Amino acid sequence: MEDPNGGQIIFNGVDIADMKVDINVHRRQMGMVFQHFNLFNNKTGVQNIMLAPVYLACRDLRRLRRKNAWIRLTNLFRGGRAKKELLPIETDKAAIKAAAQKNALSLLKRIGLEDKADVYPSTLSGGQKQRVAIIRSLAMNPDVILFDEPTSALDPEMVGEVLDLMKALAGEGMTMIIVTHEMGFAKEVANKVIFMDEGTILESAPPAEFFGTPKHPRLKEFLSKVLV
């Protein structure tokens, strides 16, 4: 969403800031969860989760069909030369939707919201909306999920249910990059904590060192105010 003006961004061994890299390929391996849930109000919980997987799978299906149509056309003019084989297509739109729905319902059950599958976001609490937003990201099977202040828009009593889900994801080995002011959560879950101020990284360390022996004066000042 931002154009870097320097440095590198290495993801799975590839510098995705390189102009030669197809960034869209790597975007499909990343999930994002924002402080505002951004669920579609005109779609049910399960439909919100299904939307991206169905859209991308159907787009890939259309591309395969177009390629096969082109192969059929070119084969008409190959004369005695060997015909090109059609690309295998092992699914259709109905199967794509059925698989996406099955996965979405499984994810809702995982977070205890299977009874909310067919309800609209307007009937959900803030914590429930954010949990649906998180599993909507999981539905794409990402390698990494980026969280931007996922609890900042929630009422205090709803923060815990979202953090518990994120702790469970961390326990399962999901790679997460989290922007947060929840220092207790960061101390418990993170394997590296980075402190930024005015767009600059001032300190980066494992949690025990970050919270136990901070070095930068600005970090010391920050921790003295937020850790009570």
Show where each model-derived region lies:
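ABC ATPase NBD coupling module
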Residues: 16-31, 93-101, 171, 213-214
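Conserved signature/switch motifs of ABC ATPase nucleotide-binding domains
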Residues: 119, 140, 172
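H-loop/switch region of ABC-family ATPase nucleotide-binding domains
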Residues: 180-181
